[in-house]
A protein has these predicted regions:
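Disulfide-rich, cysteine-dense extracellular ectodomains and adjacent flexible linkers of secreted
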Residues: 1-255
């Protein structure tokens, strides 16, 4: 019998689609799992293709699948088919997936080490398009970790980690570090303010205290009154004045 035909008793018949003639040419048998045909012959499918269900034709490997020699297999987690579906390849940067299908990770997430799943950006990191990067000094991730934002007022930090400045300190201009409150200033919660007239910072610069006896000043700075002087107001000593008529004194006290 001719190619694609089989028979016996002197009669040859073309084999149906999806089958091919046996070596002896006496019968038709289904194409093997890697082959297909429509004219009584079976041909191994090209790389990236596999037989359809009835093995009458070859078709591209399905979604998430790739292969050679007429056999398609599902790509493992973290991989997807190449463009010609002949092999599996790792998901691209910022992508992750299972079942041979890779998708870009949502903002605020990035692929895990296996690229099978997307995971939240690590502490101090933020990003979009599946890529997380450490926030610059003086900034920290926003709530959904999609972008970096300046440290809150009174806070400072490096490498994406902000913390509130201790009492008596405030952030530097770039909010990278905390620094002592300036001269005449005091405060808590990372916020320093100038002390009212007649007062000055305490030793820790965490609060303002009234000028000591015989001292007066403004703008958070107190100075001792000269001999022959006293404070203008003991409840708010803002300046030194001469002792009144008939009085004299030293150390800011007139009698």
């Amino acid at each position: 019998c001719g190619t694609g035909y089989a028979g016996h008793d002197g009669t040859c018949t073309r084999c149906p689609a999806g089958t091919g003639a046996s070596v002896a040419g006496t019968e038709c048998s289904q194409c093997d799992v890697y082959s297909a045909g429509s004219d009584g012959t079976c041909t191994t499918c090209s790389d990236g293709d596999a037989p359809n269900t009835d093995r009458t034709s070859c078709e591209s490997c399905g979604v998430g699948r790739a292969g050679t020699g007429g056999e398609c297999v599902e790509c493992v987690d973290g991989q997807e088919p190449s463009a010609d579906r002949t092999a599996c390849q790792p998901c691209g940067a910022g992508y992750a997936g299972t079942g041979g299908v890779c998708v870009v990770c949502a903002p605020g997430t990035e692929p895990d080490s296996s690229q099978a799943l997307c995971t939240s950006c690590a502490a101090g990191f933020a990003g979009s398009n599946g890529t997380c990067a450490v926030c610059a000094d003086g900034t920290e991730p926003n709530e959904d970790m999609t972008a970096c934002q300046p440290c809150a007022p009174g806070w400072a930090g490096e490498s994406g980690a902000c913390s509130q400045c201790a009492a008596g300190t405030e952030p530097t201009a770039d909010q990278r570090q905390c620094q002592p409150c300036g001269t005449g200033h005091a405060g808590t919660g990372g916020m320093c303010v100038v002390c009212p007239s007649g007062s000055e910072p305490d030793a820790q610069r965490s609060s303002c205290q009234q000028c000591a006896d015989g001292h007066a000043g403004s703008d958070g700075t107190c100075s001792a009154c000269l001999d022959g002087e006293e404070v203008n107001d003991v409840s708010q000593p803002t300046t030194c004045v001469l002792c009144g008529a008939g009085k004299a004194g030293v150390g800011g006290t007139c009698e």
